[in-house]
């Protein structure tokens, strides 16, 4: 028998992850002028979130990849992500209700995929009031 509480919790998590994915698409479009065509978000354990964004590169970046300049694409994306990190962090914190303690972005230019990674402060409600 399926536990209705567990099913409802899974549905709520699915809705939350969809909101994160939609927000990442919107942020990329706003910050970089183009949003990804596919986005998926997943919890990676209790205190981490991974967003996989596909088909994110700008036309000029795709041309750079064709020229063999993948490292330049990585470097320029890294600078852009550092400049916009606060927007990405605050958006995820608002949606999840969790405090982000670390954020990192990575790009695979050859596959045209960006990874947005968020590490949260431990959830004290889940962990109890255990001292560290």
Predicted features and spans:
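Interaction-mediating elements
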Residues: 1-132
